[in-house]
Amino acid sequence: MADGNEDARAEDMPGPAFEGYEAMELACPAERSGHVAVSDGRHMFVWGGYKSNQVRGLYDFYLPREELWIYNMETGRWKKINTEGDVPPSMSGSCAVCVDRVLYLFGGHHSRGNTNKFYMLDSRSADRVLQWERIDCQGIPPSSKDKLGVWVYKNKLIFFGGYGYLPEDKVLGTFEFDETSFWNSSHPRGWNDHVHILDTETFAWSQPITTGKAPSPRAAHACATVGNKGFVFGGRYRDARMNDLHYLNLDTWEWNELIPQGICPVGRSWHSLTPVSSDHLFLFGGFTTEKQPLSDAWTYCISKNEWIQFNHPYVEKPRLWHTACASDEGEVIVFGGCANNLLVHHRAAHSNEVLIFSVQPKSLVRLSLEAVICFKEMLANSWSCLPKHLLHSVNQRFGSNNTSGS
């Protein structure tokens, strides 16, 4: 479950609130790290990951694979949905995206090692129970791995890097064995810089021929798509956790390294990088080469090629191997992760807290709703005058559960 050789074992009326599904409302999911979270702009879908075992001397354990948690970004409420079908094994370090409310899941690490299986779950389904479907894709797949990144462009999912097994077939790119993995495993693993494309219309794998200077092999890096550019920042390669920034042109497949002006974030892995506008990326948290958890946040301005430190109220809440999703309201929603050195397994402080970063000005509707809620006693008799969709939002917010956690 670690980012390299230290094996931790183990984003009108609001859209449908999933009332039609078999669901349970609970305060919040269990604490976890190494999970996936994706967003349709209004809901954040959380799956997988692992947590510490409360019994001293026992290993960490994976979270139940059937559980899909849905966080309403407007109301701050959680729902748990039990899924069925070709349910993926419980895993950490998988890679996931949400496209048109369809969840795609690839790779990860489970109790028997790494995998390269591909799954999808359609959250638009009319069925009362959401169904996972394992897709048998055409072509040569990526090797079995975890801690990789993904870009979404047109009808393509483009995967980059990761940590896992040597490819069984000949692939384009570099694979570097982790020498220490020979000591504690019969299936040694390593880092790679492979780029693989999955066409979501044909479900066929392919590899592009890239040009330019490719980034070094890496894992636990962070990827973000803006326009036709796939950005990648940081990650771990051997003993170094890096702070280099690159982008891949997703039309021409040319790599470019960016050398930003001024100060830059320190090297890290297990961080998050989230597109928040057509010109900005938002970076939060991570883990340094010196094994220090980070709580700093930065915005990267694409047009100016510069990093700007972002002030926020969570400086005492470092996070690594967390997730981050953008909402339609100009917020970045961070969930879970570890607050200390994840590699000291019996002391790992996994979290189930939601951290909300406002990276864009709030809309007038949002400000008005917050004012109505703030002065609820004074304005309650006038609520019936609100448009139906606004009244729905107000009522949901009053039922909101606390987003704070462990």
UniProtKB/Swiss-Prot annotation:
Where on the tree of life does the source sit, at the highest rank? Eukaryota
Q: Does the keyword Ubl conjugation apply?
A: yes
Entry comment on modification after translation: Autoubiquitinated by the CRL2(KLHDC2) E3 ligase complex.
Pathway stated in the Swiss-Prot or TrEMBL entry: Protein modification; protein ubiquitination
The processes (GO biological process) annotated in the record are: proteasome-mediated ubiquitin-dependent protein catabolic process; protein ubiquitination; ubiquitin-dependent protein catabolic process via the C-end degron rule pathway
> Residues of the signal sequence?
none
Where in or outside the cell? Answer: Nucleus
Q: What is its main location?
A: nucleus
Task: Name it.
Answer: Kelch domain-containing protein 2
GN (gene name): Klhdc2
